[in-house]
Amino acid sequence: MKSFKFVLIAACAAAIGLNAEVLTKTTDISLGGKKVGKIEVLTPVEVVSKDGAKAKIKLKGAVSANYLAQIQRSVKNAEIFTVFDAESEANFKKIKEVEDDYGELWYEVEGTYEVAADALGSDANALYKQAQQKYEETCSACHRLHEPNSFTAAQWPANLQSMIDTNYVSLEETELNLIVKYLQHNAKDAE
């Protein structure tokens, strides 16, 4: 458990850099004043500017050439950062093309979006603690708790969703999103 706490602290330090913040809740994103999708809780972003109730953020990640409707952390890490309402190359700027191990084409991308300023925060630790507590309370009631590094970032969402679908556990969407992000941030690397 000590090594897990060290990983948690290291992940938080990496996520919170100069002008870097995280989303404290899943919220809408806009591009040029038009809603284009949503950005997930605990997504690390660079704050470009704040103006009252709105903030302009910059986000970097990867997009599959075959599915332009979401930005994920990287080609090998399937942690979803944004989900767009429609597939469109106008939602992001392509930085470079990358081919994965299976020959699939991906784009390293960045985008500048508007979000509600109250959805930003710099204390990821508080969110991690909240998620960890909810995960432990909810999941240890039925079985031995899986360590967060038991699965990859791509495996955690389906793992938790299967518990909900079979009615073993009931979680609000906000609780589920927070727990999934916490587990993904501490997941094992994809091979």
Set out the residue ranges of the language-model regions.
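Short, flexible, mixed-charge glycine/proline-rich loop motifs
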Residues: 129-133
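Boundary regions of SH3-family modules and the immediately adjacent low-complexity/disordered segments
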Residues: 59-127
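C-terminal capping alpha-helices of c-type cytochrome domains
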Residues: 169-191
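Gly/Gly-Pro-rich "capping" loops immediately C-terminal to redox-active cysteine motifs
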Residues: 140, 144-168
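The canonical Cys-X-X-Cys-His
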Residues: 135-145, 179, 183
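Sec/Tat signal peptide C-region and signal peptidase I cleavage site
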Residues: 15-21
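Beta-loop motif signature
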Residues: 21-47, 51-53, 61-62
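Sec-dependent N-terminal signal peptides
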Residues: 4-14
